[in-house]
Amino acid sequence: MKLKTNIRHLHGSIRVPGDKSISHRSIIFGSLAEGETKVYDILRGEDVLSTMQVFRDLGVEIEDKDGVITIQGVGMAGLKAPQNALNMGNSGTSIRLISGVLAGADFEVEMFGDDSLSKRPMDRVTLPLKKMGVSISGQTERDLPPLRLKGTKNLRPIHYELPIASAQVKSALMFAALQAKGASVIIEKECTRNHTEDMLKQFGGHLSVDSKKITVQGPQKLTGQKVVVPGDISSAAFWLVAGLIVPNSRLVLQNVGINETRTGIIDVIRAMGGKLEITEIDPVAKSSTLTVESSDLKGTEIGGALIPRLIDELPIIALLATQAQGVTVIKDAEELKVKETDRIQVVADALNSMGADITPTADGMIIKGKSALHGARVNTFGDHRIGMMTAIAALLVADGEVELDRAEAINTSYPSFFDDLESLIHG
């Protein structure tokens, strides 16, 4: 696909698609609750559609009509054995969280995904689930998909310290803990996105959170709810960066989720000197309007507890750093290696091919700016965030063309991305 290049300004206002993390969880909680759940503004990207289809295959009635998802919940013990293997597509969130959901089901399932998902290690989830009494295994010692799982009605509660900062592992164990008899304690390495905790309370569940320690008493019953999904800050991140680095630009992003566990990119933008304004804050929905303008940027250091708050935004932050004066160091981000691609290497290769100066490290990158970008051919390798990062980088290219291979990967999280880009170019 040939990308738009040499754009002189971006202007306009858009609403980004619904938050992917919250969309996944709304389907899961709605399915496990008793009664009806209605979900508004859900993301209809491929990952979320995979989760929706999996729960249909598990016997849940889910209707998508007039822009509203209606779920007839079956309760914690109401899932049915599927007739076929469960297809998780490209979604690591789906396979990991649903492994926890099925921990208490007394039937056997196989879960598989596409080529990219089949390379992602699942041992971080399978090891603690085995301690709870679940029979679960995959391929090689890292338990790569496909996974075979047989749950148990006699789940044991667990006391588990996460060896890595992972909201997916934490959430999988919380879903399992809801079905175990007794108190499970999950201790995080660093605080990660807390959508599962928030939604558990919304659906009538109980838990206690003490800093990095989460306690869930099982078993529990959940009750169907109305869920309004805010815009995804991970999708908004591409426009935040575009507005900062494309000259003569001003972008307004409406209804963006600003849950405090997800706003690391805002902290980074401010540390780099970017012009960003937050208005129309809704404390209940945890959403706001974000406005950015073209800015002179300076390098910064990104690491530690900040990383889980922006792990998915690091590819586009790397592009931002190429347009800042000085050096930006990203560290403590080895988790990037086991995303849809090895994002440390793939980001560096993609942007370096366009003229950036990025040195990959064991746990991040060293980025020297400011770089003039030029044309190149870039492959997403099936990674949606690499595709969108490249499309934003291309806007700065004055010399040559930018070709993007496997651009369809962007549909994973942002099917309307190129439509929104066109509207901002002509705004």
From Swiss-Prot:
Alphabetical GO biological process terms: amino acid biosynthetic process; aromatic amino acid family biosynthetic process; chorismate biosynthetic process
Enzyme Commission number(s) from the entry: 2.5.1.19
Keyword set, alphabetical order: Amino-acid biosynthesis, Aromatic amino acid biosynthesis, Cytoplasm, Transferase
Binding-site residues for 3-phosphoshikimate, renumbered to this chain: K20, S21, R25, S166, Q168, D312, K339
Catalytic site positions: D312
GO CC, one annotated term: cytoplasm
Family annotation (CDD domains): EPT-like
Signal sequence bounds: none
Compartment(s): Cytoplasm
Keyword Transferase: yes
Annotated binding of phosphoenolpyruvate, by residue: K20, G92, R120, Q168, R343, R385
Pfam families reported in the protein's UniProt record: EPSP_synthase (PF00275)
Main enzyme class: transferase
Catalytic activity: 3-phosphoshikimate + phosphoenolpyruvate = 5-O-(1-carboxyvinyl)-3-phosphoshikimate + phosphate
Subunit note: Monomer.
Name of the protein this chain belongs to: 3-phosphoshikimate 1-carboxyvinyltransferase
Annotated organism of origin: Streptococcus pneumoniae (strain Hungary19A-6)
Native organism taxonomy: Bacteria, Bacillati, Bacillota, Bacilli, Lactobacillales
